[in-house]
A protein has these predicted regions:
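Conserved redox-active cysteine motifs that mediate thiol-disulfide chemistry
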Residues: 48-65
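Short pre-active-site segment immediately N-terminal to redox-active cysteine/selenocysteine motifs
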Residues: 42-44, 48-52, 127
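Thiol-based oxidoreductase modules, predominantly thioredoxin-like and allied folds used
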Residues: 74-89, 101-111
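Bacterial Sec-dependent N-terminal signal peptides
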Residues: 1-24
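Solvent-exposed loop/turn segments at secondary-structure junctions
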Residues: 50-54, 82-87, 110-113, 148-150
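A short beta-strand-turn-helix
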Residues: 23-43, 67-70
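Short, internal strand/loop/helix patches
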Residues: 95-128
Length: 163
């Protein structure tokens, strides 16, 4: 009986580990550059969003679906939440879990919002959702501001994703 209980506990704890969400702070321009550079060789989508932003919430499942459909073809997806860090456990983590996000995500911890804006794109006015797409060499190839659809995201990445 102990073996059954231990086995069940092990399996249950393992499933919790798979569902656990890793959210890291994003707090400096150097960290943004390093993050983008770390995906060299992959097409990278960086999406800035928040749980309080209706268009962000609406497009989120399309981005997750796009990632699931193309991750084996060198597509990477990075979410950066603009929620308050104090909302991490009550809003951000439950939202990520409900959308099946099982990869590292970031939360804005820049001291000033303007510093994050300048680190991402000096021409960005701070409106969200904001999605930046980089080719495999780290060159920005697309900027999508406002809520978008799966088809709109796919159109931008299609040229740079191998068949």
């Amino acid at each position: 009986m102990r073996i059954v209980s231990l086995t069940a506990a092990f399996i249950f704890s393992g499933s919790l580990m798979v569902c656990a969400q890793d959210v890291k702070p994003l707090s400096s321009p150097a960290q943004v550059d390093s993050l983008i550079g770390s995906y060299s060789g992959k097409v990278l989508i960086v999406n800035l969003w928040a749980t309080w932003c209706d268009p962000c919430v609406e497009e989120f499942p399309d981005l997750v679906k796009l990632y699931q459909n193309y991750k084996d073809k060198n597509l990477a997806l990075v979410f950066v939440s603009l929620d308050q860090p104090g909302d991490l456990n009550t809003k951000v983590l439950p939202f990520l879990k409900s959308n099946g996000v099982d990869f590292v995500t970031y939360i804005n911890k820049f001291k000033k919002q303007e510093d994050l804006i300048n680190a991402i794109d000096k021409d960005w006015d701070g409106a969200i959702p904001a999605t930046y797409i980089y080719d495999s060499r780290g060159k920005m190839i697309g900027t999508l501001i406002g809520g978008k659809t799966y088809a709109e995201f796919e159109k931008v990445i299609r040229e740079d994703i191998p068949n």
